[in-house]
A protein has these predicted regions:
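Leu/Val/Ala/Ile-rich N-terminal alpha-helices, chiefly Sec-type signal peptides and the beginnings
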Residues: 1-85, 89
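Extended, low-complexity amphipathic alpha-helical repeat segments
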Residues: 95-154
Length: 154
């Protein structure tokens, strides 16, 4: 769970995709794509935050004296960890799909040259997937905060 997702802006195909869009005067697609990539970067930061919160929570739970409470909290924490891991996988899949689409379009443009009509990635289906992911992550954050508050109260 501590493996960080690679930054999507660092991918060479993303840079090349932006260059092609810029050369073709597709400013609106540049803005949409940047917005999408910024959103993904923000979600990565939230995943990293959640990962550290779960680790902190596990450490706090280990210090609890009451074995019944400790085991209950461990169980809840494991559920939260699974949710965070699932969110991380979902985000990774979305990034892979975006990068695959970008790579395909860059390669098509290279192959067909300037005569080719520049295709752009379809942003809308990625946005829908990210909204669902965001709702799931938000619920996970709330669960984690509630559990941390319970641990602090004990």
């Amino acid at each position: 769970m501590d493996k960080q997702l690679p930054a999507i802006y660092n991918d060479p195909y993303i840079s090349e995709y932006f260059k092609i869009l810029y050369k073709e005067h597709k400013e609106n697609k540049i803005n949409e794509t940047k917005e999408l990539l910024d959103y993904i970067s923000n979600m990565e930061k939230k995943i990293d935050y959640m990962t550290s919160e779960v680790l902190e929570l596990k450490n706090t739970i280990e210090q609890l004296q009451n074995p019944t409470i400790r085991e209950t909290m461990k169980s809840i924490t494991e559920d939260i960890k699974k949710t965070v891991d699932n969110g991380k996988k979902q985000l990774s899949d979305i990034k892979s799909n975006i990068l695959s689409s970008v790579k395909e379009y860059v390669n098509q443009f290279k192959q067909h040259g300037k005569q080719a009509v520049i295709k752009t990635i379809e942003i809308s289906h990625f946005k829908v997937a990210l909204r669902k992911f965001h709702r799931s992550l938000f619920k996970c954050v709330n669960k984690t905060h509630l559990l941390i508050n319970k641990c602090d109260a004990v």
